[in-house]
Amino acid sequence: MQTLIHRGMAALHQDDFAGLYTLWSGTSALDHLQEADLALLMQRCDARIQAAPGDAGPWWVKCLIYLDRSAHFNSNREQALRTVADWAGRAIGLAPDKAEAHRLLGSAHYWLDEHAAAIGAYRNAQALQPQVDLQVRLFEMESLPAGQSPQLLQLDFRDGNACHYYGAGVSIGKWKRAGLDPADAGYVDAVQFALYEHCTTLFRQGLELGDAATCNTDTHTFAMCCNNLGILYMDRGLYAQARAILEEGLRHSQFQFLYQNLREAYRHQGMRAEAADLALTLMMDYELDTPLFLDCAQAACSHLNRVGRHADVLEIAEAAQEAFEALPDDAQADPELLRMYALVQAHHRLTAARALGRLQPQQVDTALSRAAAEANPHDLDTLFVHASALGEAREYPAAVDAYTTLIAQAAQQQDAQALKRARHGRGYLLLYYLPDAKAALQDFLAVQRDGTDDFYTYYYQANCHYVLKDYRSALPACDAARALLDDAMLQADPGSAAQLYMMEANCHMNLGAYPASLAAFERSLALHERADVRESYELARQLAAKPKKRLFGLFS
């Protein structure tokens, strides 16, 4: 944008008002000028009119200033637009064969809702120079009110001004509405897509030329076009293309909606880290409404917990609490807001606090998780948050009941991953806290039958058999879990791997297979040196070293 402004100022220095108009028309350049600069620019226009009364350029620039920033000069918008119409008429008198003044006259009447006058002026401008955004406006004023189908719109793409294609795309997008004929809606969507794509092509060409470009190269408008095109790509399920065009836009200008849509594209492509980074950017750099803030907060917290930034999660949770508690009571009861807030406070915050050793059962807000679950009885994530919160609060029977509700709902919705998570959660509580290892085993066997098993499925199966002293059944489960151990798993959770090997070793020892027991103990101790495991290992060594007693001592 600064480059575009500097190029415009260079044209002004040369008294090239027509060149300045060409550079800044259709851009947001004037929006970036201070009020003092606007006043100075208007003075320069007036001085040029006095010095060169036959030059239409300064009249074009005056019209452009009033169309975009009239509030600085006249608080009455209607009067300002009448002034634009007067100035445009003078410019037409000086250069009737130039499309610019006819366009400006048409725009003054368009914003005054004087469509008949606007149509006449726009038609004159279009006859002198094809302008794709005017073609859309003409169809909008003439054909749509007459009930004609949008499919009758035929555009002339000889216009070389990239900003016109962006403006046309925005205008035609307003034609989309509920109840629009599907064929008409499809046509409008296709035309809008073509307009934005051509806009980006022209912008790229202009940016490659740099200072040699004769058209405007407003990078902010380019970024806005990339944003809108990205939305259309996502509407088509083309998330890789959406990501690429949104990232391209972000290289030229940064604004909230561009970040939001790029974050959405990242989420659809499973790029959690990148989406979380943008969520943090949005929360830090922009004033977000509470729903968006909570959505960003829950996504960011999920990723930050995953990468070990637990203290940051607690900070975000505190900010989310302030935002939520500032809402009126009726807003706090909104199911969607409750869902997101509970995810932050009753799940991510607890995960972070537990990782930092700060979690106290009495700190768990089960009332919040219960309210969220009651408001969202079919949302599987919310039901899981409530069940896990009850577990953290050590309300184990209630937590098992909540997991049972979740299992039924997940089965009804045929969500295999939610079903696995719920069965793991309930089985874990039954195994370690109630305890009921036999019932817990049924949950882990069910996960295996569903085909969603992983290391922990077999690890918990082995633990259930071990607790039930069914060592022969525990060993195949240990083998299955060990087969799923890889370097990443060992690095992420060496404690569980060590515990698995310890169970395997004890099973072998209880069955009298001392050499196998020794090997398993050594694997366990290599991951985690524990005094009790070391003691068992030494015992296994002693037992392995003793000669086996034969029947009746005949071969001893």
PLM features: what roles do these ranges have?
Residues C45, L81, A88, Y122, ...:
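Hydrophobic/aromatic packing residues within the alpha-helices of TPR/SEL1-like helical repeat arrays
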Residues M9, L64, A71, S107, ...:
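Residue-level recognition of tetratricopeptide repeat
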Residues S28-H32, C63, D68-S75, W111-D113, ...:
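Short coil/turn linking the two alpha-helices of tandem helical-hairpin repeats
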Residues P53, P96, P130, F157-G160, ...:
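Short coil turns that delineate tetratricopeptide repeat
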Residues L20, L41, V84, A118, ...:
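Single-residue signature of alpha-solenoid repeat helices
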Residues H6, V61, L104, R137, ...:
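"A position-specific structural signal for the A-helix of alpha-solenoid helical repeats
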